[in-house]
């Protein structure tokens, strides 16, 4: 049995051209995914940086310095005037 060429077979050029289009499409998809991941990472780093900058640990109070000193002296006087009562549990 011999294989005879038929007239309805697809030419060689069409096969290579179609596979070339698929390769270009796959490259575009891979490039898009890599770009999306890269943009997401940059966004996360920026958000973490902004959060850490805003919550860096320096706290401001609206109390005057005189009020702070007065409250400290009151606490010291209060603890000196009241005798400590110790409770013992049995």
Curated annotation (Swiss-Prot):
It is a single-pass type III membrane protein. It is found in: Cell membrane; Cytoplasmic vesicle membrane. Belongs to the SMAGP family. Keywords: Cell membrane, Cytoplasmic vesicle, Membrane, Transmembrane, Transmembrane helix. InterPro entries: SMAGP. Residues 1-27 are extracellular. Residues 49-90 are cytoplasmic. The keyword Membrane applies. May play a role in epithelial cell-cell contacts. GO terms for cellular component: cytoplasmic vesicle membrane; plasma membrane. The chain crosses the membrane at residues 28-48. Coiled coil: none annotated. The gene is smagp. It comes from Xenopus tropicalis (Western clawed frog). This is Small cell adhesion glycoprotein homolog.
């Amino acid at each position: 049995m011999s294989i005879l060429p038929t007239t309805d077979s697809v030419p060689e050029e069409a096969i290579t051209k179609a596979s070339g289009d698929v390769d270009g499409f796959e490259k575009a998809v891979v490039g898009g995914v890599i770009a999306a991941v890269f943009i997401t990472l940059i966004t996360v780093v920026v958000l973490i940086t902004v959060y850490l900058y805003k919550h860096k640990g320096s706290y401001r109070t609206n109390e005057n310095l005189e009020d702070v000193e007065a409250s400290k002296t009151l606490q010291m006087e209060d603890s000196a005037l009241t005798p400590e009562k110790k409770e013992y549990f049995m």
